Amino acid sequence: PDPLWSLQPRSDREAGDAVTSNFAFHAFPAKVSKASMAWNYSFWLGTISAALFLLLILSGAPLLFLYVPSVERAYASIKDIEYVVTFGSWLRSVHRVGAHLMVVVVALHLVRVFLTGAYKNGPGRGQHREWNWLMGIVMLLLTLFLSFTGYLLPWDQLAYWAVTVGTNIAS
């Protein structure tokens, strides 16, 4: 028996069905202690990061159609968004501030999960949360990567030096 499954699936399809059919239980679990829902315990950082992700999708979709991803036009398209597009400056600011907040909230969420030990096995039999921790680390790295790439999009002097420093760190 696989120690990572509380359910012992007989096939890959049954395992996949178990994951997809129980996905909603993550958002609406059957048992939740009052202590885990207290503001001073969780600070609702996971919910806030999900809300910020939704904000970034909603503010990023219009920017996706307005931005021109070329070395020659990147800076000019940012200026067009700022000064020509109606509410463009506001939209870009909402997206930028949301991205900064997302990095901070996701990092705080990681620290909170680590300090409270929420990544360890749950109270029920067969609840293995180590995979949740690994998925959280992957999502943190993805958040940092996307934040870095968004930082480069204007392709101005600041972005140029960010690429220079980033590639030097990577090498």
Locate the predicted segments by residue:
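Membrane-embedded alpha-helical bundles that constitute the cytochrome b-like, heme-associated redox core
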Residues: 1-171
